Amino acid sequence: ITGADGFIGRNLSVRLGELGYTDVVGITLESSPADLQAALSGAGFVFHLAGVNRPKDISEFAEGNTGLTETVCRILAEAGNKAPVVLSSSTQAALDNPYGVSKREAEDALLAHGKATGAPVYVYRLTNVFGKWSRPNYNSAVATFCNNIARGIDITINDPAAPVKLVYVDDVVEAFVGLLTKPEASGFVTAGPEYDTTVGQLADTIRGFAASRASMITDRVGTGLVRALYSTYLSFLPPEAFAYSVVKHSDPRGDFVEMLKTPDCGQFSYFTSHPGVTRGEHYHHTKTEKFMVLKGTAHFGFRQIVTGELHELVTKGGEGRIVETVPGWTHNITNIGDDEMIVMLWANEIFDREKPDTFAMKVKP
């Protein structure tokens, strides 16, 4: 891997290790020409990720992008090594600026190498790669926004409506390693999915991650772009910010703590109860809940508010049993053990003080 200590290189190196590849040679700026020669001569697969995108002098584009790629191809050809080569290029290769020209000429050099030697070659024109270990003010706006917002530093946005296309580093890495077991036809290949958004939407989403600690309302962070952005944002948190506190409401019955809220999938909480304490004694019309006793022994009582039908059950911590509250049934939960009881609670909606859908009524009048 050339550029092994860069953003993509680090992620790729870790993934290769996870897959059991133990003979990975990393080439960095600290490596000598002899190191590069030896690594390429014996390589079974080459990931050429090294390049220059923010040089001190514009001439470094040609040297670090075109020149280095030509060197890689020459060493491989002279060694008679027809190992497959992946080139990390850029969508800017389609542009006629110094950087774009240098990347396009690097592509041409690799494609010519493949044609001349028969070696499989793969060119990835990547766009705004983001993810953990990216560098702020260098790799992408995502890295800069995540770094600054995680630290309370202002970000600058000139045009919130400006479009931006993104690709997640994990998806890039999976495309790369996929070639090790399932080769594709030589030429231009893609890594995806690619996500289309705007600079303003990107900033708002990341700001929302930071604000969620106070509001406890988390975005839909389980799929797609938001999932990848959330993981990237968290990777920029300094260690002293890995933990945060939420409000704990305490009274003679025990504690109640709201932990996590979602826009449309309810909220998670937990509560404690001292021995003999009864909570609840109310019913709902639409609101529903799931209870799981984590510690202690609970007695649940239910009464249908119209027919008067009664039901009761007992559950203990460690049983992994969920008890649901049913609309139209008043219910309570009593700690019938000798120690503190701890109960996890999910409700299907965020508590609304204006419309609580909670009406007091004892199970046993």
Regions of interest found by a model, annotated:
Residues 305-327:
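Short acidic-glycine-tyrosine-enriched beta hairpin
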Residues 108-135, 146-147, 153-162:
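Conserved beta-loop-beta element that borders a ligand/cofactor-binding pocket
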Residues 242-281:
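A short glycine-rich, His/Asp/Glu-containing loop-to-beta-strand
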